[in-house]
Amino acid sequence: MEHKRKKQWILIIVLLLTVCSVLAVYAGREWMFTNPFKPYTFSAVSYASGDGDGCTYVIDDSNRKILKISADGRLLWQTCASDKSFLSAERVVADGDGNVYLHDVRIEQGVQIASEGIVKLSSKGKYISTVASVEAEKGSVRRNIVGMVPTEHGVIYMQKEKEGILVSNTEQGSSKAFSVADAQDRILCCAYDRDSDSLFYVTYDGKIYKYTDSGQDELLYDSDTVDGSIPQEISYSDGVLYSADIGLRDIIRLSLIHI
């Protein structure tokens, strides 16, 4: 009887240890897939964005390495073009599910663009699929995909066409065309507010516009009035339009609440 009772206690202890181990693994599951001592380096940042958890996604200046960094500065993962997930990443955003979307560009003969696409990665940086693909005109050096906006379960991306800008929503499987004159030659990049269905764009000559149905788009910013200003990437959030000014090394902030 005593031997049997002792055996029961051993089984109970083993079960308790097993349960504790499982709980510890579950509680520290993110840590288990993270090496907090692993260094990460990049010479310069080509593009960066954040998510709702405070994580930062960085594309280095080679456009061939992407890093996910936690809010407290830990490297969660990194993926490289050599892993065959992408070719040359130019933009990165993360949706509400943690999936990551890259604006991927295939370049030939130094600067000529052969094709572009939107590549979807998992929350761990692993390739899932290519959700969009755009063939470029022969000899083209200008991008056709000109912006991305994350949604809860997907991404909205903006693409230049002959008649204007096509805004596509992968979550809803829908698209909408905005008629913008000479979009192929004029537009550098775009931002989109899905709540108000508003499109904003930066032109190659340094102007920022808001699209209007009238055909006369509203001028919001003119770099000719600010010495040295060169607006580039733009994004929209809560009534404010932001643009990275690579000439002044500053952020242009345009409040649109009154517009």
Language-model region placement:
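Beta-strand-rich domains and repeat architectures in extracellular enzymes and scaffolds
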Residues: 37-64
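Residue-level detector of Asp-centered blade-edge/turn motifs that repeat once per structural unit
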Residues: 50-53, 94-97, 150-153, 193-196, ...
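Conserved small/polar residues in nucleotide/adenosyl-binding loops
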Residues: 257-259
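Conserved beta-propeller blade signature
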Residues: 56-58, 100-101, 155-157, 198-201, ...
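A short loop-to-beta-strand structural motif that recurs across blades of beta-propeller domains
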Residues: 65-67, 116-119, 164-166, 207-209, ...
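Surface loop/turn motifs at the tips and blade-to-blade linkers of beta-strand repeat domains
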Residues: 37-43, 80-84, 132-141, 178-183, ...
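Repeated scaffold domains used in trafficking and secretory/extracellular systems
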Residues: 44-47, 87-92, 142-148, 184-192, ...
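Short, solvent-exposed loop/turn segments at conserved positions within beta-propeller repeat blades
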Residues: 61-62, 109-114, 160-162, 246-247
